[in-house]
Amino acid sequence: MIDIKRIKENPDAIKAGMKAKEVDCDATIDRILELDVQVRGLKTHTETKTAEKNKLAKENGKLFGQKKDAEKKGEDTSALEAQINANMAASVKIDEEIAEDKQKLKELDDELTTCMLSLPNMPDPDLLPGGKENNQPLRYIGEKHSFDFEPKHHVDLCQNLGLIDYERGVKLAGAGNWIYTGMGARLEWALLNYFIDCHVADGYEFILPPHMLEYQCGLTAGQFPKFADEVYKIANPTDDRVHYMLPTAEAALCSIYRDEILSEADLPKKLFAYTPCFRREAGSHRADERGMVRGHQFNKVEMFQFCKPEDSDAAFDELVTKAEKLVAGLGLHFRTVKLAAGDCSASMARTYDIEILIPSMDGYKEVSSVSNARDYQARRGNIRFRREATGKPEFVHTLNGSGLATSRIFPALVEQNQRADGSIVIPEVLRKYLGGMEVIEKK
């Protein structure tokens, strides 16, 4: 969530940030300001009424003492009893008012929370406004392959070499699914092992999280409630609980320290996870996206960092560099793109995409998005650290990046490394995982 103090201090700046993301939140921001005034007013009213009740209780305590003394002396206590009863009646009425206030306060708080959760993150000020038309390619890395023959599509190459079985994948699980077979399965596993070994060498902690999550994980990551209907759900027939199949390991890693206060000495936390990812991918695929470029299940290694706010920019640069090195290590041609505000996901303040060339698609496809959420996810998940100098808890910053997803690296590798006879040259960094094999050829 965005800090409500920022909204109250400069609502126009928040509205401008939302417009840069191509989201009209003016009415929501105005409602947040109204609700905040109402909530604070109601809390003040409740506190005043509670103070009145406490004053009556204190007064009755004195009156009971006076009544007891009067009874010992045989004096008339009717006036004291009348005042005590009046105070008790007033106290009961105050209790009713406080109960009404608390119910109304809950309704207002719930609406305020809903409004706050619906706001996207503020984009960093250096991002261009608007959508993908304003994305900025920053650099092109690696030699762009040129062919002295007519290059084939990765679907044809994979089928000819027996790497992927698309038809039987559809038979098993429907459209948008495939089976890695033989050397295809080994090549996929080699890619994942290469990614994992690189992250371990960089000192990142390896995590294998559950593949299904509670709703709160998606809420913390900022993917829910807006995108809750775009992921696969598993309903438990014995109760009302629903689990959600992992759309990305980010949703799991982000919640590992939810509702915890970390020590400053523990930061940064550098994690990575391997998981299959499950996406409903509603809507039809474009004709040029046949094959494995877009599917319902794919493998991905995800990088994640929890850090102090002042270390956030350096952490972002580190993740971008790591993603670039992974692709460069494969000898593939790619580019790094700075996304415009409107092309960043709702939870992110900034994002760089690593886009790889897939020749058959005559363009670049994202294989990694490296993003900085600033304190947006930490506020949603109440993830904090205690600063040693002050002893006070502060929200951490969270960052994530694909490191990497294979469903686009695989076809890019196959197409960029193809030879005229339809064989595939294996990148040198993968050969140790494949028994030293240098080329995948048709048997």
Q: Residue locations for each model-derived region?
A:
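TRNA-recognition modules of translation machinery and tRNA-sensing kinases, especially anticodon-binding
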Residues: 26, 140-443
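N-terminal alpha-helical targeting/anchoring segments
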Residues: 1-145, 163
